[in-house]
């Protein structure tokens, strides 16, 4: 049994995960007068408190998009009594499906129902459709009795091997193709291409067109047809074989050089850009970085070079000169920033030539990663946002540097009562790594406004290779943001803190305006793909996209001394790209820490690839994934607001998942370093707010909630794998709006919601909690036994002695072996008591020193114990034997008497055994969310029994532990 069986069961479950719900259509036969005014869809929403508003004063919104039509839009719904309504008008009757989400407020993640849903329009030409939606319900009703029905092309694709053939389908039977007047037209020239025949299949819904001229692979074409006498000249774009992944394109246009962008020297600057479809390219030199400023110095023609690149060298010292590229692409004149720009002017519209060496702070040449371990398990990571860290006056940071990179360079900061804040606080906390939310150039904060109070997390990338300007003291000077970013990194390094950068290559802010797509249309983005939930997905499988991502991250690692990366929505990436990143980054620094969000998402891939999801973790060695099992086990399932977890309700149903956390072994992981264990991150509610929201039936006092917070932290900090927490979790960080309501996702909420409130340290309970976290971190760092690097070691050295089944209080206790992973201890014993009762737990034979008890934790002995110990309600206790009196742990194989039937680890011999691994790219139709998510492993297994009998077996288990 063990890990192999769990993996096989998980694969079976994921392979049959159910699809996204669709609506029930109420069909009536009515005569509707045709007109050509488009399609109206009336959305009616009921069953929610329609008077409610979020912190931005926004109530329920409808977010809707035409499938295949690019980005969608959000609309405020009009409330009338108990119904909120929005009437959507579609000018383009060629729309086949209209997607919609009802959400509370203006945040992506505040969906009323988890899944994206769709209204089918495959035979609708006009009139009105009514969609009735009930809050929190999957089913919705569609009334199309007032719709005009008719012929509609629903798909069209050129033959991959013969570009004179096109296959197209229609939504209703077509027996007379002549009446439809079917033609093929070039979208570039407007010229029609002759059709020699149109042959139907047996259904009269699928047809093969034969053309008298072959289509061009890099062209754009559409079918033109008449739906009826009233609806003539309708169009549908023909899908061509993906020219960008063809051997012809990739062999001719895959550039492998390392000199893209502007390469500066005092004597000259060489500009090189990849634009394989362009017929001419110029580099435009400007005096300023302000878009629209009439200050062109000169426009220099570029010469076509190898593998789709264009190059120009301009003599003279151009340091500080701003520039763009203009190009003729398929007859269109375009201008854009350099995709490889190293820095830019205000709002990232013009790149800037820069002497990077001139931006280095003093001592930069000797700066290096203070994290010297190649084992990711040795990291302790805290996540924070640059602005949140210091924007409050209580941060003690100088006014000029509040919310800026330079806040991290100020030592000795304190709040008004003398409590340590800022950089010194991080140092005191003892974390090894600070994970910074996006600090590349993002789109949604206007840098032209000094000290702009506009706020965003930054998951809306605009330029990937330069720092965000709003965090610098002068966004108008491209050199300042580079220098100040480096000062921040060096200061953190000088204080023994490594820097992890949060990167978002899986989607861009605006696909049509993103520089790569401007120069090579649609190259960076997958076709008609929105798995990210942000309007576009990045085509990581294309050669030059993969190169761009690897080049970019290696550049940050080398130029800015970044020590690790967290990849947003890495489940959209192909595993080859992730493995290329791991290889390239580990070559820069073997101690690099790498992890991401491995949620399974629905995305349209242009090649036969595997995605870097949790279930494919074994295919991406050296790369970790957020362990949502831990999160949901400790505080309750993210998407079930009424559910309590192990730490905040002694939920016995969560015990198995807590033990899988302790052993660093979620069902999908292949190595302990792949399990990023956490209670909270920037997404969703803070841990403290979640605990206050989720309480057992008998309720918790504030003191008990504080204990639950500490217990959840203790489990993460003493478990195998990699501990991670949101900065402020240790001081009960809350995010509430002006009305006192919890903010679920504060992506664009004001500073009043997002900032770290350093004055809370004035409260003794808050300061004590901070000390508790610091003590846990110090204890973890002092004991390698908490940081074992293989499942073989864990299997040999960790024994679950009390597995939560001994009584109704779900107590768990485990023992770590003497000298495990090079530890100096003769044994470690850890006990978790989530109940409201004091529990007496029998200790293994030996003399034990207590290091964690009640609200105290650290590396100082708090007391001694022998035989047994009382464990306080809702608390953790950690004891260490240091005199050789404890017996060594026997391997935990599920046969340890009555104490345990849980296997904590699996042999590393399975690491290369395909049969032991989960299915690839599982759950493709799982509901998608930006930021945080949950791996769906709950499924129905339907077993059909032949011989006149059938049975349905339902297997429902969160993780197969």
What name fits each language-model region?
Residues 943-961:
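C-terminal membrane-anchoring or membrane-association module
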Residues 35-54, 81-160, 210-270, 292, ...:
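The feature marks proteins involved in alpha-glucan
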Residues 275, 319-321, 862-891:
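C-terminal beta-strand-rich structural cap/linker in extracellular carbohydrate-active enzymes
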Residues 387-560, 570, 574-589, 593, ...:
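Substrate-binding/active-site clefts of carbohydrate-active enzymes
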Residues 18-36, 927-936, 954:
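Sec-dependent signal peptide cleavage junction
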Residues 672-845:
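Loop/helix patches that line or flank the sugar-binding groove of alpha-linked glycan CAZymes
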């Amino acid at each position: 049994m063990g890990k192999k069986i769990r993996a096989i069961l998980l694969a079976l479950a994921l392979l049959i995960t159910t699809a996204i719900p669709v609506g029930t259509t109420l069909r009536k036969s009515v005569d509707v007068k045709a007109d050509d005014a488009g399609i109206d869809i009336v959305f009616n929403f009921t069953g929610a408190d329609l008077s409610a508003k979020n912190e931005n004063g926004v109530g329920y919104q409808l977010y809707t998009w035409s499938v295949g039509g690019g980005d969608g839009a959000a609309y405020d719904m009009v409330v009338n009594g108990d119904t909120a309504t929005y009437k959507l008008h579609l000018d383009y009757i060629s729309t086949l499906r209209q997607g919609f989400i009802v959400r509370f407020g203006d945040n992506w993640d505040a969906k009323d129902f988890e899944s994206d849903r769709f209204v089918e329009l495959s035979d609708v030409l006009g009139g009105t459709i009514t969609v009735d939606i009930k809050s929190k319900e999957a089913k919705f009703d569609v009334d199309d009795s007032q719709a005009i029905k008719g012929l509609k092309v629903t798909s069209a694709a050129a033959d991959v091997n013969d570009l004179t053939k096109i296959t197209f389908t229609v939504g209703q039977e077509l027996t007379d193709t002549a009446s439809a007047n079917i033609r093929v037209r070039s979208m570039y020239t407007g010229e029609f291409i002759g059709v020699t025949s149109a042959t139907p299949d047996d259904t009269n819904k699928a047809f093969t067109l034969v053309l008298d001229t072959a289509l061009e692979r890099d062209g754009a074409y559409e079918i033109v047809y008449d739906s009826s006498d009233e609806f003539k000249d309708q169009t549908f774009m023909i899908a061509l074989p993906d020219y960008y992944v063809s051997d012809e394109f990739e062999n001719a246009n895959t550039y492998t050089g390392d000199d893209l962008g502007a390469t500066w020297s005092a004597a000259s600057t060489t500009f090189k850009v990849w634009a394989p479809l362009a017929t001419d390219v110029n580099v435009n030199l400007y005096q300023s970085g302000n878009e629209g400023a009439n200050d062109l110095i000169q426009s220099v023609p570029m010469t076509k070079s190898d593998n789709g690149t264009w190059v120009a060298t301009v003599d003279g010292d151009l340091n500080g000169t701003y520039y763009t590229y203009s190009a003729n692409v398929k007859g269109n004149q375009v201008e854009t920033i350099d995709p490889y720009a190293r820095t830019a002017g205000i709002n990232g519209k013009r790149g800037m030539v820069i002497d990077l060496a001139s931006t280095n702070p003093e001592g930069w040449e000797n700066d290096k990663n203070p994290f010297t371990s190649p084992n990711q398990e040795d990291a302790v990571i805290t996540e924070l946002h640059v602005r949140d860290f210091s924007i409050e006056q209580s941060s003690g940071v100088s006014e000029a540097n509040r919310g800026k990179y330079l806040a991290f360079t100020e030592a000795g900061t304190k709040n008004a009562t003398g409590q340590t804040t800022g950089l010194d606080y991080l140092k005191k906390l003892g974390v090894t790594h600070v994970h910074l939310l996006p600090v590349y150039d993002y789109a949604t904060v206007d840098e032209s406004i000094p000290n702009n109070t506009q706020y965003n997390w930054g998951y809306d990338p605009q330029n990937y290779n330069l720092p965000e300007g709003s965090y610098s003291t002068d966004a108008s000077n491209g050199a300042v943001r580079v220098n100040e970013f480096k000062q921040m990194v060096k200061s953190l390094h000088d204080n023994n803190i490594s820097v992890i950068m949060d990167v978002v290559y899986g989607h861009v802010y605006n696909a049509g305006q993103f520089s790569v797509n401007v120069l090579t249309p649609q190259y960076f983005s997958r076709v008609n793909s929105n798995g990210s939930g942000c309007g576009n997905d990045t085509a990581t499988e294309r050669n030059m996209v993969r190169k761009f991502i690897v080049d970019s991250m290696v550049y940050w690692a080398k130029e800015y001394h970044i020590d690790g990366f967290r990849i947003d929505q890495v489940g959209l990436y192909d595993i080859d790209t992730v493995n290329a990143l791991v290889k390239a980054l580990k070559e820069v620094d073997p101690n690099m820490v790498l992890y991401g969000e491995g949620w399974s998402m629905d995305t349209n891939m242009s090649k036969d690839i595997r995605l870097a999801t949790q279930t494919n973790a074994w295919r991406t060695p050296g790369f970790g994934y957020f362990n949502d099992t831990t999160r949901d086990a400790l505080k309750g399932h993210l998407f079930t607001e009424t559910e309590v977890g192990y730490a905040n309700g002694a939920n016995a149903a969560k015990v198995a998942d807590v033990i899988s956390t302790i052993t660093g072994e979620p069902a999908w992981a292949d190595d302990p370093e792949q399990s990023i264990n956490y209670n909270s991150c920037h997404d969703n509610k803070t841990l403290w707010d979640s605990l206050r929201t989720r309480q057992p039936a008998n309720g918790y006092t504030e003191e008990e909630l504080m204990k639950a917070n500490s217990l959840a932290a203790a489990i993460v900090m003493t478990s195998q794998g990699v501990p991670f927490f949101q900065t402020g979790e240790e001081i009960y960080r809350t995010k509430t709006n002006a009305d006192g309501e919890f903010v679920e996702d504060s992506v664009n909420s004001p500073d009043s919601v997002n900032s770290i409130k350093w004055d809370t340290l004035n409260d003794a309970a808050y300061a004590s909690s901070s000390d508790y976290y610091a003590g846990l971190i110090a204890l973890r760092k002092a004991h390698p036994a908490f940081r074992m690097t293989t499942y073989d070691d864990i299997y040999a050295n960790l024994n679950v002695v009390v597995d939560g089944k001994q009584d109704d209080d779900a107590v768990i206790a485990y023992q770590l072996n003497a000298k495990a992973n090079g530890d100096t201890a003769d044994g470690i014993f850890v006990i978790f008591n989530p109940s409201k009762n004091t529990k007496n737990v029998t200790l293994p034979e030996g003399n034990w020193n207590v290091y964690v008890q009640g609200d105290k934790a650290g590396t100082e002995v708090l007391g001694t114990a022998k035989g047994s110990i009382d464990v306080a309600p809702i608390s953790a206790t950690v004891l260490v034997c240091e005199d050789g009196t404890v017996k060594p742990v026997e391997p935990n194989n599920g046969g340890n008497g009555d104490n345990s039937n849980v296997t904590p680890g699996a042999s590393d011999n399975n690491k290369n055994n395909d049969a032991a691994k989960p299915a690839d790219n599982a759950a493709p139709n799982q509901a998608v969310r930006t930021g945080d998510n949950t791996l769906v492993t709950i499924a129905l297994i339907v077993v059909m029994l032949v011989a006149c009998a059938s049975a349905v077996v339902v297997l429902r288990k969160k993780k197969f532990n």
